[in-house]
Regions:
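A local structural micro-motif
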Residues: 9, 33, 55, 74, ...
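An extracytoplasmic/periplasmic, membrane-proximal ligand-sensing/linker region
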Residues: 27-30, 67, 93, 115-177
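Short N-terminal micro-motifs specific to bacterial/archaeal maturation
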Residues: 34, 53, 82, 109-112, ...
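Hinge/capping helix and adjacent helix->loop/strand transition within the periplasmic-binding protein
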Residues: 1-42, 91, 104-137
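Structured helix-beta-strand junction loops
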Residues: 3-7, 50-51, 68-70, 94, ...
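Ligand-binding pocket segment of bilobal, Venus flytrap-like solute-binding proteins
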Residues: 7-88
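C-terminal lobe and pocket-closing loops
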Residues: 62-131, 162, 176
Length: 177
């Protein structure tokens, strides 16, 4: 991308992917203009078809395309390699330890939801995640079946807000409400 900055662009479908790519740009000096897409599948397809130069995307739509040889994975975000792509280095191994980003999904309830209801929902969710069949299916889709208490999850969210605030400011990113 540095060799042809006039053609440097990247696909993104969410603030998470945009912020992660902008972090990579800030740490490497790489140029690139964001091209918006509606979803991860469209992002990967845009790279396969040569419409965009690169993307940072989640595992479910990406891993099958990498394994099929339709796109080349240069690195996985984070400090460790993915067990689904053991030959692909981590960002840390590639020389960018500060591009340690882990995407997560969460389950939210309305503010003021009674603690007993939250506990019931959490118990049911954890039972599903702990089911070996569900866990194996999630892992096969490149989804890490984690789990956190509401307090731990709040800490994760607050940490990410702190971690990425400078990226959003420096890259002058604007997101719709």
């Amino acid at each position: 991308m540095k060799a042809h900055p006039d053609k440097a662009n990247y696909a993104s479908s969410s603030p998470a992917f945009t912020i992660t790519t902008e972090l990579l740009k800030l740490k490497t000096g790489m140029p690139g203009t964001m091209i918006p897409y509606k979803g991860s599948g469209e992002m990967i397809l845009s790279v396969i078809q040569g419409q965009t130069a690169m993307t940072i995307a989640d595992g479910p739509p990406t891993v099958p395309q990498v394994k099929a040889g339709k796109v080349k994975a240069l690195a996985v975000t984070g400090a460790e390699r993915s067990p689904l792509l053991p030959d692909v280095p981590s960002m840390t191994e590639a020389g960018f330890p500060s591009v340690d980003v882990h995407l997560w999904s969460g389950v939210f309830a309305t503010t003021g939801t009674p603690p007993a209801v939250v506990a019931t929902l959490r118990k049911a969710l954890n039972q599903s995640i702990d089911d070996p069949g569900v866990s194996a299916k999630l892992k096969a889709m490149a989804v890490d079946p984690g789990g956190a208490t509401p307090d731990q999850f709040e800490h994760i969210i607050e940490g990410d807000i702190t971690k990425f605030a400078d990226v959003v400011k420096t890259a002058n990113l604007k997101f719709e409400d």
